[in-house]
């Protein structure tokens, strides 16, 4: 709260970010998931409730939900561990019927619980896939379309460097890397969000130890 941060990434399942193909992060999901013999799922939301209570007490107004598909093009499902097995992961294509069936049950229940726990659709952000490139345009479109109805009325944003995704209406609310923001500003994209991470090291500010202090002035360079 003191730093002005009011949104927090909420690991409902392990975030599929910055992992090599076939690799994965340590499982950190908040929600326990059990699949019954008939293929339906049961969810334990108790840790999510505890998380939301903690966030509300500490001034977190918005929750960010991990990407529903893997980074750089939405070609696979993220890691979703159940009680005893890894159910979905790199071995699961994004449009696999079993994963799609899971999402169709999971997302409505998740949304209902988020509202119950104090975070309505105006205070939750969903993601499809992080930083899709042109070589992944079709897979991203297909993944986005597969959850379109489930996310209807909810906010969906994605990190983006390729302007054509916005131009074609595929990503309607881009969060643009600072070293690619120029084309978005030039084309007067309304209220663009900007981000920086480890990739923004040349010609744009960042906060690496080796940089002179004048290159740390991120707020100044982001002001439009």
Annotate each predicted stretch with a short phrase:
Residues 153-160, 171-179:
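Short, hydrophobic beta-strand segments that form beta-sheet elements in well-ordered domains
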Residues 150-151, 223:
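Extended alpha-helical regions
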Residues 1-150, 159-168:
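Aromatic-lined carbohydrate-binding surfaces of glycoside hydrolases
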Residues 172-224:
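Catalytic-core region of carbohydrate-active enzymes that cleave or remodel glycosidic bonds
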Residues 154-166, 194-199:
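A generic structural motif
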């Amino acid at each position: 709260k003191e730093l002005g941060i009011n949104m927090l990434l909420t690991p409902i399942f392990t975030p599929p970010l910055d992992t090599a193909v076939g690799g994965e992060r340590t499982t950190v999901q908040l929600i326990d998931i059990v699949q019954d013999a008939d293929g339906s799922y049961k969810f334990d939301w108790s840790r999510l409730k505890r998380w939301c209570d903690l966030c509300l007490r500490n001034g977190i107004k918005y929750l960010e939900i991990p990407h529903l598909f893997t980074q750089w093009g939405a070609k696979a499902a993220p890691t979703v561990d159940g009680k005893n097995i890894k159910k979905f992961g790199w071995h699961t294509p994004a449009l696999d019927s079993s994963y799609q069936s899971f999402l169709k049950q999971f997302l409505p229940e998740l949304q209902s619980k988020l509202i119950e726990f104090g975070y309505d659709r105006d205070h939750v952000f969903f993601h499809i896939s992080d930083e899709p490139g042109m070589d992944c345009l079709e897979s991203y479109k297909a993944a986005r379309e597969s959850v379109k109805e489930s996310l209807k009325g909810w906010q969906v944003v994605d990190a983006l460097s390729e302007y054509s995704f916005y131009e074609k209406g595929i990503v309607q609310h881009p969060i643009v890397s600072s070293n690619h923001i120029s084309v978005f500003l030039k084309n007067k994209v309304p209220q663009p969000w900007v981000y920086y991470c480890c990739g923004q090291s040349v010609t744009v500010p960042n906060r690496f130890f080796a940089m002179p202090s004048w290159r740390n002035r991120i707020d100044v360079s982001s002001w439009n």
